[in-house]
Design a protein with these regions (language model features):
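Conserved ABC ATPase "signature" C-loop
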Residues: 213-214
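The feature captures the beta-strand-to-loop junction immediately N-terminal to the Walker
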Residues: 36-38
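Conserved ABC ATPase signature
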Residues: 134-138, 142
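ABC ATPase "signature
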Residues: 219-220, 228
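Helix-to-loop junction immediately C-terminal to a conserved catalytic motif
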Residues: 51
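Conserved catalytic motifs of ABC-family nucleotide-binding domains
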Residues: 155
Length: 252
């Protein structure tokens, strides 16, 4: 069953700038799908439409077989975790309070929130002692781990991730990529991950969708795209033969 479905969706920001053109895309339960493309290709817009942050001009979006316009927007967003590059942790709250924020506004018992925060901080590879700290006391990589933990707090079925590791150093970035792959394997959440980094897209995704100017150019598994690029645009986007051979050795 498609957990998320786009049916002939169009979106523009003004009359002469169409950012999503006739989008038809189904995302199955438990998939880790990476959306890749150049800046301005429409990737982040897709996440915002899934989360109800942006209305569509025409077409339909379904979440769990229910058209998005029929959802209570608060209930929808509580069932979707969102992780962004800027993280957005509340600086005046402890890490425990940040992780438990969504549960707190749902009036979950305090003890349940505390136990959930402990479970999640361990799940993302951090010790319980970090729960007492504040965001300013953490490194960039640690704050991103907390951001992932917070996104998982309400046990959502869907996790949206928008260039979440773009602001950290390369070593930390690779470590976070490894962590999110393990989390997906362990929790089987549906993850929609936006990136402009080709290697990251192939490392993480069970399916890759390549966008250009608001349209899907090619979608498929790592093997399908690497072995059978649809056209010259895809070939050029993937890079030179040396890099493509590297991707094949790493991911096929």
């Amino acid at each position: 069953m498609a957990l998320i479905k786009f049916d002939k969706v169009f979106k523009s920001y003004d009359s002469d700038k169409i950012v999503i053109k006739d989008l038809n895309l189904s995302i199955e339960n438990g998939e880790f799908i990476t959306l890749i493309g150049k800046s301005g290709s429409g990737k982040t817009t897709i996440l915002k439409m899934i989360n109800g942050l942006l209305p569509i001009d025409s077409g339909k979006i379904f979440i769990k077989d229910k058209e998005i316009k029929d959802w209570n927007i608060i209930e929808l967003r509580r069932d979707i975790g969102y992780v962004i590059q800027q993280i957005g942790l509340f600086p005046h709250m402890s890490i425990e309070e940040n992780i438990g924020y969504v549960l707190d506004i749902k009036n979950e018992p305090k003890q349940n929130i505390k136990e959930r925060a402990k479970y999640l901080i361990n799940l993302v590879g951090m010790k319980n002692s970090y729960l007492e700290k504040y965001p300013r006391e953490l490194s960039g990589g640690q704050r991103q781990r907390v951001g992932v933990a917070r996104a998982l707090a309400a046990n959502p079925d869907i996790i949206l991730m928008d260039e979440p590791f773009g602001a950290v150093d390369e070593i930390t970035r690779r470590s976070l990529q490894d962590e999110i792959v393990k989390l997906h394997q362990r929790l089987n959440k549906t993850i929609v991950f936006v990136t402009h980094d080709i290697e990251e897209a192939f490392k993480l995704g069970t399916r890759i969708v390549l966008f250009e100017k608001g349209s899907i150019i090619q979608e498929g598994t790592k093997k399908e795209i690497l072995m059978n690029p649809k056209n010259k645009f895809v070939e050029d986007f993937l890079g030179n033969k040396i890099f493509i051979n590297y991707l094949k050795e790493m991911f096929i």
